[in-house]
């Protein structure tokens, strides 16, 4: 499983990119609004940092508007992936872009049927939302497993991006159950790298070394 960062904050992207683990970036209108910056200028800056898929979401709700927005975004770089909602209009736009070999990420997926529809419309990626399913008492991890199994059985190339990741267990389980990517907030990346035994072990090594120098 590969790692994406879920943010529109350029400094967070730059920081995690320096670790050498980032395959790409996902953004959405909420994340962009939080930063209070021009969307296109932000994307250009992200493209300069990360050489990988950058999911940029449209805000139109009709296929025509999604296509118009998506074409402008796709013109920025071959690394731009058009992020579309899991709706009938979103599927129409997905089909349009698939025919033109422009990659798409169908988002707000909450069922295996939705994922299968998106894949058959030509989606490059589907993004099932784990945390939001947990919030309503449903099993987001089982959804990842179901989608992975269905795609495998039917030879579907669409890749799974585990989204709405809230904590490290989501990451471990998504990897274990067949997700191709997890898109993770910077805060959770920092939780992934931390472990108290790592910290205490490092402190002991340094203390032992210091005692040798006396």
From Swiss-Prot:
Gene3D superfamilies: Aldolase class I. It catalyses: D-sedoheptulose 7-phosphate + D-glyceraldehyde 3-phosphate = D-erythrose 4-phosphate + beta-D-fructose 6-phosphate. Keywords: Cytoplasm, Pentose shunt, Schiff base, Transferase. GO terms for cellular component: cytoplasm. It is an enzyme of class 2 (transferase). GO terms for molecular function: aldehyde-lyase activity; transaldolase activity. It is found in: Cytoplasm. GO terms for biological process: carbohydrate metabolic process; pentose-phosphate shunt. Pathway: Carbohydrate degradation; pentose phosphate pathway; D-glyceraldehyde 3-phosphate and beta-D-fructose 6-phosphate from D-ribose 5-phosphate and D-xylulose 5-phosphate (non-oxidative stage): step 2/3. InterPro entries: Aldolase_TIM, TAL/FSA, Transaldolase_3B, Transaldolase_3B/F6P_aldolase, Transaldolase_AS, TSA/FSA_arc/bac. The active site is at residue 83. Its EC number is 2.2.1.2. It comes from the Bacteria. Belongs to the transaldolase family. Type 3B subfamily. NCBIfam families: fsa_talC_mipB. PANTHER family: TRANSALDOLASE. Transaldolase is important for the balance of metabolites in the pentose-phosphate pathway. This is Probable transaldolase.
């Amino acid at each position: 499983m590969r790692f994406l960062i879920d943010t529109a904050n350029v400094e967070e992207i730059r920081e995690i990119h320096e670790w050498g683990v980032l395959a790409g970036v996902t953004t959405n209108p909420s994340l962009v609004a939080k930063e209070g910056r021009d969307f296109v200028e932000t994307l250009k800056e992200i493209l300069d940092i990360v050489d990988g898929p950058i999911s940029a979401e449209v805000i139109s709700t009709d296929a025509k508007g999604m296509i118009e927005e998506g074409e402008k975004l796709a013109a920025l770089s071959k690394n731009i992936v058009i992020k579309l909602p899991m709706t009938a209009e979103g599927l129409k736009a997905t089909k349009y872009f698939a025919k033109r070999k422009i990659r798409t990420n169908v988002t707000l997926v909450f069922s295996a049927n939705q994922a299968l529809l998106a894949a058959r419309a030509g989606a490059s990626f589907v993004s099932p939302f784990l945390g939001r399913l947990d919030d309503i008492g449903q099993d987001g991890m089982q959804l990842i497993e179901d989608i992975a199994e269905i795609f495998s059985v039917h030879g579907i190339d669409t890749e799974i991006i585990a989204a709405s990741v809230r904590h490290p267990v989501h990451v471990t389980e998504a990897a274990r159950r067949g997700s191709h990517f997890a898109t993770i907030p910077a805060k959770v990346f920092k939780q992934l790298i931390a472990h108290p035994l790592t910290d205490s072990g490092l402190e002991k090594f340094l203390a032992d070394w210091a005692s040798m120098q006396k």
